[in-house]
From Swiss-Prot:
Cytochrome bo(3) ubiquinol oxidase is the terminal enzyme in the aerobic respiratory chain. Catalyzes the four-electron reduction of O2 to water, using a ubiquinol as a membrane soluble electron donor for molecular oxygen reduction. Has proton pump activity across the membrane in addition to electron transfer, pumping 2 protons/electron and generating a proton motive force. All the redox centers of this enzyme complex are located within the largest subunit, subunit I. Protons are probably pumped via D- and K- channels found in this subunit. The gene is cyoB. Fe(II)-heme o binds at residues 288, 411, 419. The chain crosses the membrane at residues 15-35, 57-77, 102-122, 136-156, 190-210, 235-255, 278-298, 316-336, 347-367, 381-401, 414-434, 457-477, 494-514, 594-614. Coiled coil: none annotated. One of its GO terms (cellular component) is plasma membrane. It is found in: Cell inner membrane. Residues 1-14, 78-101, 157-189, 256-277, 337-346, 402-413, 478-493, 615-672 are periplasmic. It comes from Pseudomonas putida (Arthrobacter siderocapsulatus). Cu(2+) binds at residues 284, 333-334. This is Cytochrome bo(3) ubiquinol oxidase subunit 1. Heme b binds at residues 106, 170, 421, 481-482. The keyword Translocase applies.
Length: 672
């Protein structure tokens, strides 16, 4: 009845795991207790769990990303301390099979369940506002996408206490990932977590491409869109083009494991290298899916805090497109050692080097934007400046690895690990944190504490260099990745230094948590009354903070480049409307939540071969969707009187803050 599932699946013999599970259980009880005590279940259900508001969905994505950052970093610091402890005659404190699960989970979590939802959250929060839209093209699909991601998150975390996770590394290469060498459920957890979350990501890509193409404000040309919107658009093009490849590769691995096919096996006609090609045909575009939106954040931040129009706006768009296109022509550089031959390696090596050209264009455009600007050293701009230095180093090491001869020496060494973290942490993570600080007041109505934000930055950037620069040296010294023990005394000092760096990053994360607490505590002293705390240039800053659920009382018209800045310069930033009209909005729905819940059960049942539950959960998922489709809900109308009331309250607050243009009267904002 329960397939392969039994009480033996719970790792009672692993004290670290059991203590972690106990802490998670206590934390969960505390959260449920707090929600019950403050009687917030109804509010949580109606305002968040069933919402289709892109802004709230964006916030939920970011919350998931931050929770998974803590989980992924816990894995990272365990790996670093294990490697420092397991030298010479010592075996460290993690058994090899546990360590293997940790480094696999770390990679999967940080890329799929931390970085991706962080980017998606910022995109949900800002893009519709930047293009003057009231919501995304398919609001229900947006909700479903989030709950598909959450299904993958749940499966990854369930594997901690029920069964095991994959021991293959985050790439899950066969034949190691095949049923012969990984007969447990770990690889199955990996497959279904990635399949469900990947489906959600694909739907998000389609949703936002349609949103940008069809729902821009009247008069907003494509070339006038903010750079963050453009980089997200290019990222969504990559998502739609690449994620189906991952879906297909994992589906083929699934039939290998479940139905004894021989697609990626070493015998009976199978070819493991086909999986490697398919994986990286998705995997390298995935790197640019992560980094392009961060480039967009840096563009917005640089322009805003330099007080200047972004230098080379059009060239930024073309450079982003070039990066996206070239990103599909470089995947083989991940396995130059495969034996494809000198001609193939040369082509992919040159293509990899070419990507540095449009990336360099971006870097110089940011520098020229800063040049002669009146730079304000807020936390977002500090993350941006830290990125420029750190990412440049990571990019140069990437160009080195693009040389096939050098790659033959450094392949699978810690040099590659250092390079990858150099560009992902120094690029994507720094960018997302900058974007979080930049758009936080827009989402919540008050600014983050600057002192703690800057402290977090200094701990993060110093910790990064202390943690990962030694790994470059260790790579040159011959230390390979995925070791759980070393016996070379020359490596030990570098491993100890790397632990110190990880601890510094831990302090940085602690500062961010303190920053959140202090900011919420002191929110009344840091309110964003105007909706434009930074002196922004794009449309999202024309709305209140947080924006009303309908975003714009009137759709912006004749929107050009830096539309909000131009409106402020012309003195028409808060021009009163002649009258307000009713607004059509989509209704909340619980369908996405229940589909995500049933698909989580579906994945869990497939992992443990509980076939009756597979069928039941699939039928339930289809039934919930059919019920939703049959309802044909057309949404609802927000009365003009309600719109006028909300806008009137905002204008009174603006008048009190002295932000209204000269001669404007509050009464003029309340016409219906």
């Amino acid at each position: 009845m329960f397939g392969k599932l039994s009480l033996e699946a719970i790792p009672y013999h692993e004290p670290i795991v059991m203590v972690t599970l106990a802490m998670i259980a206590l934390g969960g009880i505390a959260v449920v207790g707090a929600i019950t005590y403050f009687r917030k279940w109804t509010y949580l259900w109606s305002e968040w769990l069933t919402t289709v508001d892109h802004k709230k969905i964006g916030v939920m994505y970011i919350i998931v990303a931050m929770v998974m950052l803590l989980r992924g970093f816990a894995d990272a610091i365990m790996m670093r301390t294990q490697l420092a402890a397991a030298t010479g005659g010592s075996e460290g404190y993690l058994p090899p099979e546990h360590y293997d699960q940790i480094f696999t989970a770390h990679g999967v979590i940080m890329i799929i369940f931390m970085a991706m939802p962080f980017f998606t959250g910022l995109m949900n929060l800002a893009v519709p506002l930047q293009i003057g839209a009231r919501d995304v093209a398919f609001p229900f699909l947006n909700s479903l996408s989030f709950y598909l991601l959450l299904a993958g998150v749940l499966l990854v975390n369930i594997s901690l206490g029920v069964g095991e996770f994959a021991k293959t590394g985050w790439v899950a290469y066969p034949p190691l990932a095949g049923i012969q060498y990984s007969p447990g459920v770990g690889v199955d957890y990996y497959i279904w977590a990635l399949q469900l979350s990947g489906l959600g990501t694909t739907l998000t890509g389609v949703n936002f491409l349609v949103t940008v193409m069809k729902m821009r404000a009247p008069g907003m040309k494509l070339m006038d869109m903010p750079i963050f919107t453009w980089t997200c658009t290019w990222a969504n093009v990559l998502i739609v083009a690449s994620f189906p490849i991952l879906t297909a590769a994992l589906a083929l691995l699934t039939v290998d494991r479940y139905l004894d096919f021989h697609i990626f096996t070493n015998e009976l006609g199978g070819n493991p290298m086909m999986y490697v090609n398919l994986f990286w045909a998705w995997g390298h575009p995935e790197v640019y899916i992560l980094i392009l939106p961060a480039f967009g954040v840096f563009s917005e931040v640089t322009s805003t805090f330099a007080g200047k129009r972004l230098f080379g706006h059009h060239s930024m768009i073309y450079a982003s497109g070039a990066i996206a296109v070239l990103g599909f022509a470089v995947w083989l550089h991940h396995f130059f050692t495969m034996g494809a031959g000198a001609s193939v390696n040369t082509f992919f090596g040159l293509a990899t080097m070419l990507i540095s050209i449009p990336t360099g264009v971006k870097l110089f455009n940011w520098l020229f934007t800063i040049y002669q600007g009146r730079l304000r050293f807020t936390a977002p701009i500090m993350w941006t400046l830290g990125f420029m230095i750190t990412f440049s180093i990571g990019g140069m090491t990437g160009v080195l690895l693009a040389v096939p001869g050098a790659d033959f020496v450094l392949h699978n060494s810690l040099f590659v690990i250092a390079h990858f973290h150099n560009v992902i942490i120094g690029g994507a993570v720094f960018g997302y944190i900058a974007g979080f600080a930049y758009w936080f007041p827009k989402a919540f109505g008050f600014t983050l504490n600057e002192k703690w934000g800057k402290a977090a930055f200094w701990f993060w950037i110093s910790g990064f260099y202390v943690a990962f620069m030694p790994l470059y040296a260790l790579g040159f010294m011959g230390m390979t990745r995925r070791l759980n023990h070393s016996d070379n005394p020359l490596w030990e000092p570098y491993l100890y230094v790397a632990v110190v760096g990880a601890v510094l990053i831990l302090f940085g994360i602690a500062c961010q948590l303190i920053q959140l607490y202090v900011s919420v505590r002191d929110r009344n002293q840091n309110l964003d009354v105007t909706g434009d705390p930074w002196g922004g240039r794009t449309l999202e800053w024309s709305t209140s903070s947080p924006p009303p659920f309908y975003n714009f009382a009137h759709m912006p018209e004749k929107v050009g480049l830096d539309a909000w800045h131009e409106a402020k310069e012309a003195g028409v930033a808060y021009k009163p409307a002649a009258k307000y009209e009713a607004i059509h909005m989509p209704s909340n729905t619980s369908t996405g939540l229940f589909m995500g819940l049933f698909l989580t059960v579906f994945g869990f049942a497939f992992i443990w071969h509980i076939w009756w539950l597979v069928g039941a959960s699939l039928v339930a998922t289809i039934a919930v969707f059919v019920r939703h489709a049959a309802r044909d809900d057309q949404g609802y109308m927000v009365p003009a009187e309600e719109v006028a009331r909300i806008e009137g309250e905002r204008m009174k607050a603006l008048a009190k803050a002295g932000a209204l243009p000269a001669g404007a009267r509050v009464e003029s904002f309340e016409r219906v």
